[in-house]
Amino acid sequence: IPIVLLSGYCWLDPNLRSILGLAWDCGAVTTGPVTVPLVLSLGIGIANAAGKGDSSLSGFGVVTVASLFPILAVLCLAIFVSYTVSPEQIIAAASAGKALIASQATVETSVWDKTPLIEIVLGVRAILPLVLFLMFVLFIVLRSTLPNKMVTTYGLTLSILGMCIFNVGLTYGLGAIGAQTGSALPAAFMELPISQFSPIYPEAVGVVLVIGFAWLLGFGATLAEPALNALGLTVQSLTNGAFKKSMLMYSVAGGVSVGIALGVAKLVFTLDLMTMLLPLYLIGIAMTVVSTEEFVNVAWDSAGVTTGPVTVPLVLAMGLGLGNAASAVEGFGILALASICPIVAVLSMGLAIQLRQKM
């Protein structure tokens, strides 16, 4: 509720309205392949140890809370800055930053720009501090021991190596092709300087093709998310196979694909984000009230696991590229829509299962 109220306040302020897409997207990018498995394990472990909840899925819901607070923090920061800094100062600082970047473009690049060293450092930084903190809590605070030390060390080593390689692949592969594709997509329905054949199709056909591409991108990228696979396996294990992993993954992927398609439609038709986001959240809240705890916990956690290291680089790059090419006010907001739609999709699936059981 506080987030919705702050979003409404920002929406009514012309100077703050453009921050809404960024703020809601921040909630979608905070939970990734490192955070989600850890948070899921902690929530389930604490719930089982404390004996809280009547359901095996009562430990879910922590990922949702972890996704909401970044939105709240960005909105509060934006409101604070709006009261302490004038729009003219912000514009001047942005112009100075652009000039600095332009001047640095002519300077010889450093080793960080010529090699994937920064991606490797970020991969190590993503896991190593967290591992050290968990070791401190386990050994010093809880005075416990680590079973299967060799297996755990082997797994942690592979995790760090895998994250480093994954970061390099994202930077030089998915991120680059996502930005290029997003910049070229508007050529399907409008004239662009980068394409001599634009517009390639009539406007109506081109718009349908772009939105259809966004739908397929969302569906395929979501199925490839490691965090969603981890969530599906956890749910299937806790419910002894009653809640199939494939059933959850396909319903979540369908919701994300619809959300990304709506986000692209927002950019193409320059629609207002809050008029699309608020009704979906109201629908989600209404369905939450009438759904069972099992589906509510899983549904709201699915919002945090769908926007991970595969989806985010592609969608952000495509959204910003499409927004710049189509001269949209801002290219953010796609991830926010991609987060709420799977919640509605999983809750709808849960209500359908409940209705079928009653019949």
Kindly give the residue locations of the regions a language model identified.
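Helix-loop-helix junctions within the multi-pass membrane cores of secondary transporters/permeases
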Residues: 1-5, 204-288
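Small-residue-rich segments of transmembrane alpha-helices in multi-pass membrane proteins
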Residues: 2-8, 31-37, 65-74, 156-167, ...
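Signature of multi-pass transmembrane helix bundles
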Residues: 50-177, 182-188, 200, 332-341, ...
